[in-house]
């Protein structure tokens, strides 16, 4: 017997930007499909018209592509199992709604929202978990038909509910959690499978789509666990075999230990936000993979090819995944340091232009200068937008020394070192990094000062920073006129402080 070909799906709702959690779902499905040489389907679940955002699906697809996630079938690619938008599959859903009604497994319900809420309030007052109770209890078929006709005459629009069998256990062997089960009396009563506007509910449409699209494995977030028994009710009613389910654990804020919520503004949560900051897609792909999945060994840096080769759902964690911003920055920095310099240049130049530090029209000479700036500061950048803050001194007038910089210079008698360096700097034949280092060595010989006591005062006076790339390269790019101005301002400030 031939091995069943794996088919997975990522099925977002077009309700906004691509969230980290949704990106993880797409990524794990992608890795699972590619590892097994299977098929990945993209399906747009847009039945909730009120929540849909114009351009939402296009934005999500664009950000998935940016991350390096592609799919084999979808609304933009077609395929043998389309349409791939739920809003275009209404006739398909109606066919199965009718089948269930004809078989007596589903029925029209005319209870109004006010009646349902009153029922829930009464149940709460009695200490009972709110649930729907069958509105035709004890009625004959003719009486039910008459009650429905009366409701229609009043202009009431029905929903369609599916019968939940009594005293049943719905269980599955979860790819992440292991054995999971629900009793039928905990599901909340007969639930809606078609809304008053004629659109199917999520838990009905997803079953129809997964079955007809021959989905074999469903990897999704932990928040869908409670949906699974409802979907199993539908599978059973239609006589279909369900796919294998795997529910990934929650993502929590590593600082607070609380579930990552879109209302938590302490963490950027949308892929587009990280794109705007200049994070690299390969780094984001790497980081998101580690949110709830553990590789073999200690390494944390992997190429996409390596992750596809090694991905095994058995290594998905049963514990919540901690979103650690510092770890993301560290991972991205590893990629920045080895990234193609043309890619970094494009990102950093865009950041500098958005900040108004570089004009929209850039001459070849200016472009080469920015390229060198990016090259020497790449090692410091967790993401490329940081270049705006760490290189502002190259574009703006020098600020006064900070208190920390003054304290650093005060540790030793730095004035003679700074004055001698200015003298040596203005004596070099060419203003290059090599010649700048020669000037520093000449300062060492003339003053007898070496090590940190030599380099730190020079770095602070010339570049207005206590950290940075090679001091020779930084001073060369800053230019002779600007460096001299910085040194003069430093000496004046020291004089004003009586130093």
UniProtKB/Swiss-Prot annotation:
Quote the Pfam families the UniProt record gives. Answer: Anticodon_2, tRNA-synt_1c
Q: Which UniProt keywords apply?
A: Aminoacyl-tRNA synthetase, ATP-binding, Cytoplasm, Ligase, Nucleotide-binding, Protein biosynthesis
Its primary localisation, in coarse terms, equals cytoplasm
**The UniProt record lists the keyword Nucleotide-binding:** yes
Find motif ('HIGH' region) and give its ranges.
Answer: 12-22
Q: What class of enzyme is it?
A: ligase
Annotated compartments? Cytoplasm
Biological processes per GO annotation: glutamyl-tRNA aminoacylation
Q: Could you give one GO CC term from the UniProt record?
A: cytosol
Q: Which reaction does it catalyse?
A: tRNA(Glu) + L-glutamate + ATP = L-glutamyl-tRNA(Glu) + AMP + diphosphate
Q: Which domain of life is it from?
A: Bacteria
Q: Which Gene3D superfamilies match?
A: 1.10.10.350, HUPs
* Keyword Coiled coil appears in the UniProt entry: no
Q: What is its EC number?
A: 6.1.1.17
**Which Gene Ontology terms cover its molecular function?**
ATP binding; glutamate-tRNA ligase activity; tRNA binding; zinc ion binding
Q: Which residues are listed for ATP binding in this entry? A: 262
- Membrane spanning stretches: none
Span of the signal peptide? none
Write out the residue ranges of the motif 'KMSKS' region. Answer: 259-263
Family statement drawn from the similarity comment of this UniProt entry:
Belongs to the class-I aminoacyl-tRNA synthetase family. Glutamate--tRNA ligase type 1 subfamily.
Q: Tell me the NCBIfam families matching this sequence.
A: gltX_bact (TIGR00464)
Q: How does it assemble?
A: Monomer.
Name the job this protein performs: Catalyzes the attachment of glutamate to tRNA(Glu) in a two-step reaction: glutamate is first activated by ATP to form Glu-AMP and then transferred to the acceptor end of tRNA(Glu).
Under which name does UniProt file this protein?
A: Glutamate--tRNA ligase
- Source species of the chain: Lactobacillus gasseri (strain ATCC 33323 / DSM 20243 / BCRC 14619 / CIP 102991 / JCM 1131 / KCTC 3163 / NCIMB 11718 / NCTC 13722 / AM63)
Gene label:
gltX
């Amino acid at each position: 017997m031939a091995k069943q070909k794996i088919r997975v799906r990522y099925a977002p709702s077009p309700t906004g930007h691509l969230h980290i959690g949704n990106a993880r779902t797409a990524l794990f499905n992608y890795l699972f499909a590619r590892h097994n040489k299977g098929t990945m389907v993209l399906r747009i679940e847009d039945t909730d018209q009120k929540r849909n955002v114009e351009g939402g699906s296009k934005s999500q697809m664009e950000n998935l592509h940016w991350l390096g996630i592609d799919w084999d079938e979808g609304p933009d690619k077609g395929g043998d199992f389309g349409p791939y938008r739920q809003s275009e599959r209404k006739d398909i859903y109606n066919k199965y709604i009718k089948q269930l009604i004809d078989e007596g497994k589903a029925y029209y319900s005319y209870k109004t929202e006010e009646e349902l809420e009153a029922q829930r309030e009464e149940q709460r007052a009695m200490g009972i978990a709110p649930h729907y109770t069958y509105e035709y209890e004890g009625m004959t078929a003719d009486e039910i038909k008459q009650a429905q006709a009366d409701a229609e005459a009043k202009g009431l629009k029905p929903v369609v509910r599916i019968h939940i069998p009594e005293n049943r256990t719905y269980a599955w062997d979860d790819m992440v959690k292991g054995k999971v089960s629900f009793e039928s009396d905990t599901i909340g009563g007969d639930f809606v499978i078609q809304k008053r506007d004629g659109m199917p509910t999520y838990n009905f449409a997803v079953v129809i789509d997964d079955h007809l699209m021959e989905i074999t494995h469903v990897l999704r977030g932990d928040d869908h666990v409670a949906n699974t028994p409802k979907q199993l009710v539908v599978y059973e009613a239609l006589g279909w075999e369900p796919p294998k389910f795997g529910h990934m654990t929650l993502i929590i804020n590593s600082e607070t230990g609380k579930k990552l919520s879109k209302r938590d503004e302490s963490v950027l949560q949308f892929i587009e936000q990280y794109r705007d900051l200049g994070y690299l897609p390969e780094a984001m792909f790497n980081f998101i993979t580690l949110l709830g999945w553990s590789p073999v060994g200690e390494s944390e840096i992997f190429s996409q090819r390596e992750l596809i080769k090694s991905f095994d759902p058995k290594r998905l964690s049963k514990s919540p995944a901690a979103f650690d911003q510092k770890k993301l920055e560290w991972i991205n920095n590893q990629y920045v340091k080895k990234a193609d310099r043309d890619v970094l240049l494009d990102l950093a130049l865009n950041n500098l232009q958005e900040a108004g530090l570089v004009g929209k029209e850039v001459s070849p000479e200016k472009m080469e200068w920015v390229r060198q700036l990016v090259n020497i500061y790449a090692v410091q950048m967790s993401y490329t937008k940081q270049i705006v803050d760490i290189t502002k001194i190259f574009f703006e007038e020098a600020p006064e020394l900070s208190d920390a910089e003054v304290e650093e210079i005060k540790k030793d008698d730095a004035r003679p070192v700074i004055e001698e360096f200015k003298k040596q700097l203005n004596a070099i034949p060419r203003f290059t990094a090599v010649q700048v280092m020669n000037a520093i060595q000449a300062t060492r010989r003339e003053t007898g000062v070496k090590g940190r006591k030599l380099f730190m005062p020079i770095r602070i006076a010339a570049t207005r920073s206590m950290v940075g790339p090679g001091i020779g390269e930084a001073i060369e790019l800053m230019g002779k006129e600007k460096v001299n101005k910085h040194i003069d301002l430093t000496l004046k400030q020291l004089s004003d402080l009586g130093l």
